[in-house]
């Protein structure tokens, strides 16, 4: 698509199937891609902590003031990069919430101080929430990796939900689906 002068009649879609560009060098004006993947979860726990309280394993984050934190049930066991510890972020109710402490195997915590957040609230790990958006390319860069690795590392514990025109048209849950 970038090289019309070639005599080949096929192209390797690769990462473009996710609506992501294979490299920064690609002319993005020549081919407009729209991200085809969003990653969502939900809040499972909300807790107030005191100043001086450590968060997560190793307490690599220590609260410098009283804070409210929310627990998100996603971790490196799902393919979410541990390298986002203390530097990644999510969106809850359209607002950016920073990851506090280490990303664990099955969960991580975020700062929701001053927000009206409750258990069950939708969490956007990648995608749009209101006027805000988290791009997989940005998360991959924060994690010190690239978009291919980010999307390929998402494991079978993460259910797939296929949406077309705002409606769910299919699902794949490797733990809930029946196999014969």
Where are the regions a protein language model picked out?
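Active-site anion/phosphate-binding pocket segments in diverse small-molecule metabolic enzymes
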Residues: 1-180
């Amino acid at each position: 698509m970038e090289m019309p002068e070639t005599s080949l009649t096929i192209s390797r879609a690769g990462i473009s199937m996710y609506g992501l560009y294979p490299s920064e060098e690609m002319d993005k004006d020549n081919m407009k891609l729209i991200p085809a993947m969003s990653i969502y979860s939900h809040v499972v726990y909300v807790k107030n902590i005191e100043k001086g309280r450590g968060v997560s394993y190793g307490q690599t984050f220590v609260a410098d003031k009283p804070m409210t934190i929310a627990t998100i049930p996603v971790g490196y066991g799902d393919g979410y990069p541990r390298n986002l510890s203390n530097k990644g972020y999510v969106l809850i109710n359209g607002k950016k919430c920073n990851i506090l402490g280490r990303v664990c195997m099955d969960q991580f915590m975020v700062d929701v101080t001053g927000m009206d957040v409750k258990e069950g609230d939708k969490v956007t790990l990648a995608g749009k929430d209101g006027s805000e958006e988290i791009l997989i390319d940005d998360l991959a860069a924060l994690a010190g990796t690239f978009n291919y690795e980010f999307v390929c590392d998402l494991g079978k514990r993460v259910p797939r939900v296929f949406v077309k025109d705002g409606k769910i048209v299919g699902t794949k849950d490797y733990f809930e689906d029946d196999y014969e």
